[in-house]
């Protein structure tokens, strides 16, 4: 089994990366393979709404990094999306992925999705809701934890001081692993 973790934050290796890797630790303990993608390293243009992707399983526009990232999403059993807010790159990924999935029905069906946010104080629920709506609209299964899938902190590393939030991420990783084993 494989889980792709996508850091939508513009801050590479910041708080969002820390919480995704915290979830990865729990998945790795159960023998689940993980791969980390930093969207800050990937150029993703907005969707052109050409619908040429219909029946092809991926976007036909190959001048940016979307097709490679989406191929990894399709090939994974589970997907973690993380963003402090819905960053422009995350928004482009969700928009284009949404169109590709809509015209290629079932391509993401029954995959497991987890949305997480690392925030200073506010905005996390909007980000988590947006990413969860992507999952649910594409017939995916969404894993939850003991509380909202958010951790608080501003400066890089501050999220590690949010003991409750980090414990929640660990629990989320354990829940994700349990669900993946039941699905597979």
Language-model features: locations:
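Hydrophobic residues within alpha-helices
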Residues: 19-27, 93, 131, 176
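N-terminal beta-loop-helix "entrance" segment that forms/cooperates
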Residues: 39-58, 154-161
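Glycine-rich phosphate/pyrophosphate-binding loop and the adjoining helix
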Residues: 1, 24, 29, 62, ...
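N-terminal beta1-alpha1 ligand-phosphate binding loop
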Residues: 2-30
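Cysteine-centered iron-sulfur cluster-binding motifs in ferredoxin-type domains/subunits
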Residues: 8-17, 45-54, 77
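Helix-loop-strand module that forms the ligand-binding subsite of alpha/beta enzymes
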Residues: 60-146
């Amino acid at each position: 089994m494989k889980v792709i973790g996508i850091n939508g934050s513009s801050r590479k290796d910041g708080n969002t990366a820390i919480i995704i890797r915290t979830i990865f630790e729990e998945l790795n303990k159960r023998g689940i393979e993980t791969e980390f993608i930093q969207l800050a390293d990937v150029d993703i243009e907005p969707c052109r709404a050409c619908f040429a992707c219909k029946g092809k399983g991926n976007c036909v526009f190959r001048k940016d990094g979307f097709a490679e990232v989406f191929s990894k999403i399709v090939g994974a059993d589970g997907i973690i999306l993380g963003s402090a807010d819905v960053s422009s790159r995350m928004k482009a990924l969700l928009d284009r992925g949404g169109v590709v999935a809509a015209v290629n029905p079932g391509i993401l069906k029954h995959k497991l999705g987890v949305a997480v946010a690392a925030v200073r104080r506010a905005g996390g629920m909007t980000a988590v809701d947006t990413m969860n709506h992507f999952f649910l609209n594409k017939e995916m299964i969404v894993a939850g934890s003991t509380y909202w899938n958010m951790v608080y902190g501003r400066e890089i590393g501050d999220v590690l001081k949010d003991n409750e939030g980090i414990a929640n991420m660990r629990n989320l990783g354990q829940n994700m692993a349990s669900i993946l084993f039941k699905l597979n």
